[in-house]
């Protein structure tokens, strides 16, 4: 089965690579329109997936990721339309020169070819990834989680119908609908057909891909994100950022999971934090230095377990640790962070600059929420993933991250001397 999918995707990629920006945008507009026109089919399929997942004991954070509403589906369609409005990087001349021989040399952006994406209970990923791949002239093979099998099947059927109505092969966007996990291992060895693999899921999935894949893998998306509260912070303003970073949508990978508080401001900051977190329904997981003071406040507080510093809660839970100074905070982030998104809240710009220079994450913020790490917020449109590695892309992966380049030499029957 996968062999045939790979052949179809590779053949489709050759046709996609020849499309103009206008032709690709016409396809995307058709997909967006059809997602809205066929919304009832997609939402009914999703309702069945959610019901099964709830019956099987899936946690609330994952159920939130899985669930589609009419508003969310409309937002997904609107995201596709936003991709239409983005500049197409394919064909862009990155740089060029004329050599002494007279050969005119250009480095030009081209599609990667076929992208493979493995993800879990995130039905929006199906459309986000497909739209970005099509915009950049890439075919894509999707493998969603078993929890989203009906939703993904319905969504991909809509996309394929839109492709065919525009004269393009359905093989441009395909989904593996068999939940057999052995197919994941088989997919990881499809280097004959797939040019880049992107896993979007937990640490176990990323480890599996790194160990078994014969295809170049882009890893990331696991967000153990930190905010360091410096001693010079403006408490009221800092709390607004923390509430946003923790509560706006707790199930996302750019949500803060650990708050590092400078010991010199703890006495004034912790009571205010407790009050604010109580109002927001956040459970605080406090270290020994913060526990007693936080327990005196209104927030729900438990003693933090050492392993929780490495946890991506994806829920209304927040670690709180007292640190001696900026060096202590940076050391903690280096040990427990996932190089996703980390922030400092401070009025001391020297400390801010040190934090930016010394915290080696894909996105580092000064006096801002970690929630900004998002393709849409960065002006990239829908993102295919957030990469926490350094090759071939880093941070939110937009259109350029789905391209490579080729060298093109144009001569007049020019020969090398």
From Swiss-Prot:
Pathway of action: Amino-acid biosynthesis; L-proline biosynthesis; L-glutamate 5-semialdehyde from L-glutamate: step 2/2
GO biological process, alphabetically ordered: L-proline biosynthetic process
Source taxon at top rank: Bacteria
GO molecular function: glutamate-5-semialdehyde dehydrogenase activity; NADP binding
Localisation per UniProt entry: Cytoplasm
Keyword Amino-acid biosynthesis part of the UniProt annotation: yes
Matching Gene3D superfamilies: Aldehyde Dehydrogenase, Chain A, domain 1, Aldehyde Dehydrogenase, Chain A, domain 2
Catalytic activity: L-glutamate 5-semialdehyde + phosphate + NADP(+) = L-glutamyl 5-phosphate + NADPH + H(+)
EC code(s) of this entry: 1.2.1.41
Chief place where the protein resides: cytoplasm
InterPro entries: Ald_DH/histidinol_DH (IPR016161), Ald_DH_C (IPR016163), Ald_DH_N (IPR016162), Aldehyde_DH_dom (IPR015590), G-glutamylP_reductase_CS (IPR020593), Glu-5-SA_DH (IPR012134), GPR_dom (IPR000965)
Keywords, sorted A to Z: Amino-acid biosynthesis, Cytoplasm, NADP, Oxidoreductase, Proline biosynthesis
S-S bridge residues: none
Alphabetical list of NCBIfam families matching this protein: PRK00197.1 (NF001221), proA (TIGR00407)
Family: Belongs to the gamma-glutamyl phosphate reductase family.
Known role: Catalyzes the NADPH-dependent reduction of L-glutamate 5-phosphate into L-glutamate 5-semialdehyde and phosphate. The product spontaneously undergoes cyclization to form 1-pyrroline-5-carboxylate.
Protein's name in the database: Gamma-glutamyl phosphate reductase
Species for this entry: Escherichia coli O139:H28 (strain E24377A / ETEC)
Gene: proA
């Amino acid at each position: 089965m996968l062999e045939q999918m790979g052949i179809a995707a590779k053949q489709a990629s050759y046709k996609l690579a020849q499309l103009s920006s206008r032709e690709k945008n016409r396809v995307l507009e058709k997909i967006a329109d059809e997602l809205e026109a066929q919304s009832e089919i997609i939402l009914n399929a999703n309702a069945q997936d959610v019901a099964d997942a709830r019956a099987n004991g899936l946690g609330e954070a994952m159920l939130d990721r899985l669930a589609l509403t009419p508003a969310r589906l409309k937002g997904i369609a609107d995201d596709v339309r936003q991709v239409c409005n983005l500049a197409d990087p394919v064909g862009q001349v990155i740089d060029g020169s004329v050599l002494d021989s007279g050969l005119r040399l250009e480095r030009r952006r081209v599609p990667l070819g076929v992208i493979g994406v493995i993800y879990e209970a995130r039905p929006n990923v199906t459309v986000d990834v497909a739209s970005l791949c099509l915009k950049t002239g890439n075919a894509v093979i999707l493998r969603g989680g078993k929890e989203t099998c009906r939703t993904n099947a319905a969504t991909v059927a809509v996309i394929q119908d839109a492709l065919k109505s525009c004269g393009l092969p359905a093989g441009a966007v395909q989904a593996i609908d068999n939940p057999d996990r052995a197919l994941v291992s088989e997919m990881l060895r499809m280097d004959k057909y797939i040019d880049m693999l992107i896993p979007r899921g937990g640490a176990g999935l990323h480890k599996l891909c790194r160990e078994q894949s014969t295809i170049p893998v882009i890893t990331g998306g696991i967000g153990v994100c930190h905010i360091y509260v410096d001693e010079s912070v403006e408490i009221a303003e800092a709390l607004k950022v923390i509430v946003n970073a923790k509560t706006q949508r707790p199930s996302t990978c750019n949500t803060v999971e650990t708050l590092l508080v400078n010991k010199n401001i703890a006495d004034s900051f912790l009571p205010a934090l407790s009050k604010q977190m109580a109002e927001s329904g956040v459970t605080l997981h406090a270290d020994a230095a913060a526990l007693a003071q936080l327990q005196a406040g209104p927030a729900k507080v438990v003693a933090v377990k050492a392993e929780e510093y490495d946890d991506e809660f994806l829920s209304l839970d927040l670690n709180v640790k007292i640190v001696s100074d900026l060096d202590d905070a940076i050391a903690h982030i280096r040990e427990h962070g996932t190089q996703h998104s980390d922030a400092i809240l401070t009025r001391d710009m020297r400390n801010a600059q040190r934090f930016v220079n010394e915290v080696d994450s894909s996105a580092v913020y000064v006096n801002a929420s970690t929630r900004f790490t998002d393709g849409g917020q960065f002006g990239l449109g829908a993102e295919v993933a957030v990469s926490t590695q350094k090759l071939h892309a880093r941070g939110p992966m937009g259109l350029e991250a789905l391209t490579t380049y080729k060298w093109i030499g144009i001569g007049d029957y020019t020969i090398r001397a």
